A protein has these predicted regions:
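Core segments of cupin and vicinal oxygen chelate
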Residues: 8-50
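A short, acidic/glycine-rich surface segment
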Residues: 29, 38-39, 61-66, 100
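Short, charged/polar surface micro-motifs in flexible loops or helix N-caps
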Residues: 46-50, 60-62, 84
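Acetyl-CoA-dependent GNAT
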Residues: 57-61, 126-128
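Short glycine-enriched loop/turn motifs at secondary-structure junctions
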Residues: 1, 69-74, 105-106
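Vicinal oxygen chelate
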Residues: 42, 79, 88-128
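N-terminal beta-strand motif that seeds the catalytic metal site of vicinal oxygen chelate
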Residues: 1-16, 74-79, 128
Length: 128
């Protein structure tokens, strides 16, 4: 059984706010990991379905950068949204980076790509 995906963040509060605001994820728990001087937070959709997103913040991390897209080992997260244009409009108002405007993936599916505050690529999916 697939349990969770973990991504790093440079600012825990900002990331929790981002995923809560735009994807309605709710904070399940936060934990201090003393051995690695880190904090982790688990978020999940409001209905408690789907896999969990783990955010990891290392306090002693001096530098936080994303490599060029072609050099990344992790590709992207994906979230289904009810109305892709309305979602992107709200994201634009919050200065979210939109990397690919909406386009038809197939006759029933429209997708777009954005970045979270730390540059993690996120696919938005609208299914009709």
């Amino acid at each position: 059984m697939f349990v969770h995906t973990s991504i790093r963040t440079s600012n825990m509060e900002r990331s929790i706010d981002f995923y809560s605001k735009f994807f309605r994820l709710k904070l399940l728990s936060r934990h201090e990991i003393k051995q690695t001087n880190a904090e982790i937070a688990f978020l999940q959709d409001a209905e408690g379905k789907g896999c969990t997103l783990e955010l990891t913040f290392f306090r002693n991390q001096n530098k936080f950068t994303q490599p060029a897209y072609e050099e990344r080992l992790f590709d992207h997260l994906a979230f289904e949204v009810a109305d892709i244009n309305k979602t992107l409009e709200a994201m634009r108002e919050s200065n979210v980076v939109i990397t690919d405007e909406p386009f038809k993936f197939n006759e029933k599916t429209t997708i777009a790509f954005i970045e979270d505050p730390d540059g993690t690529l996120i696919e938005l999916i609208e299914r009709k």
